[in-house]
Regions:
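Activation segment signature within eukaryotic-like protein kinase domains
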Residues: 192-193
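Catalytic-loop of the protein kinase fold
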Residues: 204-221
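Glycine-rich ATP phosphate-binding loop
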Residues: 113-127
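Conserved short submotifs of the Hanks-type protein kinase catalytic core
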Residues: 161-174
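Activation segment/activation loop of eukaryotic-type protein kinase catalytic domains
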Residues: 221-255
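C-terminal lobe substrate-recognition/regulatory segment of protein kinase catalytic domains
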Residues: 316-364
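Short beta-strand micro-motifs within the conserved protein kinase catalytic domain, predominantly
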Residues: 152-164
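Protein kinase glycine-rich loop
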Residues: 103-109, 114
Length: 391
C-alpha cells in the first residue's frame, strides 16, 4: 500500500531505469501471448506509457505494468473510454510547480514532462544529461526571439527540485489529435497549414531549422485554430547552435518517424530548412486523406531497422532516386544510388486518389528528393489550395 508520505507527484521518484525495466518485463510477458513478435516491443512501450500517464500512485503504476504471460494487453485508455474534454477540471488537487498551483500531468517526452495549471502548460525538464540535439536552454533562448504563430514562451524558472521549467499558454488540442479523430474538413486543413507555413516562413527567414515537424508539434487553440508551431527542443539556430553544431556538421538524428527528410537519412550534415518542408509535405498528405494515415511507413524509433524501413517506403512510394532526380545526393557520404533495389514509384494521383488536385500539387512540390527544388514556406502559401476560401 502506498505510504502516507508518498508525494502527490509519485512520478518524481521513478527513474528512467525503473521505466526501462518495466518495459522489458512487459515485453517478455507479451512474447508469451498470441501477439506477433514484431508487435510486442511497441505494445510494451504503449502499455508502460499508459500506466505512467494514468496511474495515481506508484503502486497503481507497478500493478498496471505487471502483465502475466499469455495475458492480452490492456486496451489503451483513449480507446476504452471517451477522452475528457480539454477544459474539464481534474478530480485530484494536483501538485505545485514553482509558483503554479494545481498542476496536473499531461504527457512526457525524451527529456521533459508536461503539466497543466489552469491556462498554463509547464514543460519540466527531467533529463539533465546532454542528449543532443535536445537542449531546453537553447529552446528557451530561441523561443524568446519568436512571435506568433510560434508558441509564445511565457516564463522560465527553476522549480522546487531545481528542475528547469518552461511555461507556455495551454493549448487543448494538436493536429495529431485531429488526425486521430478521422477525416479533417478541407477548410480546416487549409487554415491550420496556413498557420504552419506562416510560422515556418518566420523561422526560416531567421535561419532557424525546426528539425521535428510532425502533427503533435502543431498545437491548436480550438478545433478551428489558430495553430501554433511548438516543440523547439531540437531546433537549430545559426548563432546559438553553431558552437556545437557547425552549419556543415549538423546532427543527423533529427525528426520523428515518417516525417524525416531523406537528406538526413543519407548523411547530409549540411541540410537546411528544406527538411522542415519535407516534414510539412508528408503531414499535409496525411491530413488530406479521407482516412488519415502517414504517407510513408516507419517503425518506432526504438525498433531495429526503423530507418531502413522508412527509406524503402519512400522509394516504393515515389520511386528510387536517380542522379537526375537527386543530384545533390552525389556528394553525400552514403549516396543512395545503386545501393537498393530500384523501384519505379507511383504517381501522386495513384498515391493520393482521394485528395484534390490542388492539394496534390502542393504535396508534390514539397515531397521532392532534391531539397533545393522543394517549395519554400512563402511559396507554399501562394499555392491555390492555400489561397482559396473554399475547395
Amino acid at each position: 500500500m502506498t505510504s502516507e508520505s508518498e508525494p502527490l507527484d509519485w512520478r518524481a521518484s521513478l527513474s528512467s531505469a525503473d521505466r526501462y525495466d518495466n518495459i522489458q518485463a512487459i515485453k517478455a510477458a507479451l512474447e508469451h501471448s498470441d501477439l506477433p513478435a514484431s508487435a510486442t516491443h511497441q505494445d510494451a512501450f504503449s502499455i508502460e506509457n499508459e500506466a505512467y500517464k494514468t496511474s495515481s500512485s506508484r503502486d497503481q503504476y507497478d500493478a498496471a505494468c505487471r502483465i502475466k504471460p499469455g495475458r492480452e494487453p490492456p486496451l489503451p485508455t483513449e480507446l476504452a473510454q471517451p477522452a475528457a474534454a480539454p477544459d474539464e477540471a481534474p478530480e485530484s488537487p494536483g501538485i505545485i510547480i514553482g509558483s503554479y498551483q494545481s498542476c496536473h500531468y499531461v504527457a512526457s517526452g525524451v527529456t521533459a514532462e508536461v503539466y497543466r495549471s489552469k491556462v498554463t502548460a509547464l514543460k519540466v525538464i527531467v533529463e539533465t544529461r546532454n542528449i543532443e540535439p535536445h537542449d531546453p536552454f537553447r529552446e528557451a533562448k530561441i523561443l524568446k526571439l519568436l512571435e506568433k504563430p510560434c508558441i509564445p514562451l511565457l516564463d522560465t524558472f527553476r522549480d522546487q527540485e531545481q528542475r528547469f521549467t518552461l511555461a507556455f499558454p495551454f493549448m487543448p488540442l494538436s493536429l495529431e489529435a485531429l488526425v486521430k479523430q478521422g477525416p479533417i474538413p478541407i477548410d480546416r486543413i487549409r487554415r491550420h497549414f496556413r498557420d504552419l507555413f506562416t510560422a515556418l516562413s518566420y523561422i526560416h527567414e531567421r535561419g532557424i531549422i525546426h528539425r521535428d515537424i510532425k502533427p503533435s508539434a502543431l498545437l491548436l487553440e480550438s478545433i478551428d485554430g489558430p495553430a501554433y508551431l511548438s516543440d523547439f527542443g531540437t531546433a537549430w539556430h545559426p548563432e546559438l547552435s553553431v558552437s556545437t553544431e557547425p552549419a556543415d556538421q549538423k546532427i543527423l538524428d533529427i525528426g520523428t518517424g515518417p516525417y524525416r527528410a531523406p537528406e538526413a537519412l543519407f548523411g547530409d550534415k549540411a541540410y537546411g530548412t528544406a527538411v522542415d518542408m519535407w516534414g510539412a509535405g508528408t503531414m499535409l498528405a496525411e491530413c488530406c486523406r479521407k482516412s488519415p494515415q502517414p504517407l510513408f511507413e516507419s517503425r518506432a524509433a526504438h525498433e531495429d531497422g526503423n530507418q531502413l524501413g522508412l527509406i524503402l517506403s519512400i522509394f516504393k512510394s515515389i520511386g528510387s532516386p536517380t542522379k537526375e532526380s537527386w543530384p545533390e545526393a552525389a556528394k553525400f557520404k552514403t549516396p543512395p544510388f545503386e545501393m537498393y533495389q530500384v523501384f519505379e514509384g507511383r504517381s501522386w494521383e495513384d498515391l493520393l486518389p482521394d485528395v484534390g488536385v490542388e492539394f496534390r500539387e502542393l504535396i508534390a512540390a514539397l515531397v521532392k528528393y532534391n531539397s533545393s527544388n522543394r517549395a519554400t514556406a512563402p511559396e507554399a502559401l501562394q499555392f491555390k489550395c492555400m489561397t482559396e476560401t473554399n475547395n
